[in-house]
Amino acid sequence: MNADAKKAALRMIPYGIYVLTADDGKGGVAAATVNWVTQTAFAPPLVVVGVKTDSGAYGIVKSTKSFTLNMLGKAHKGLAFTFFKPAQFEGGKLSGQAVHKGTNGAPILEAALAAVECKVTSIVEQGDHHIVVGEVTEAHVPNPISGRPDNAILEMKDLGDNVFYGG
């Protein structure tokens, strides 16, 4: 296979930018910027997310069978970069960001446009990112979204011409 062609083709798949959060209930909190996310069913509402297997977030999600996806808006580029590295939970803030706990215990970013709390229904363990299937159990949209909701979301292409993930 031509490696350059593979990279170019796979980078044509559009990605939103999200922050996945999880809490182990014992003081362990993790957050990670993720972009391999999609809805896969209406009833029950299911989402899938690719989570890097050697991340702290993956360990907590696998053990607790729950997570929250925080949707970032176009103005949240800085948040995306904040959670590219391991998160710190100090003084009730997650890497300096205001949060509150959802019903599943995972942090919800106060700045997020929306968040969905999920219970894990299955994990496909293949590759360097495992596919986590989550049933949406709660949804939060703290403020009305003007226009199409999908136009409000931060996308990989919004992070600049030199920021890629995948390929």
What is the role of each PLM region?
Residues M1-G167:
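Basic, polyanion-binding surface patches
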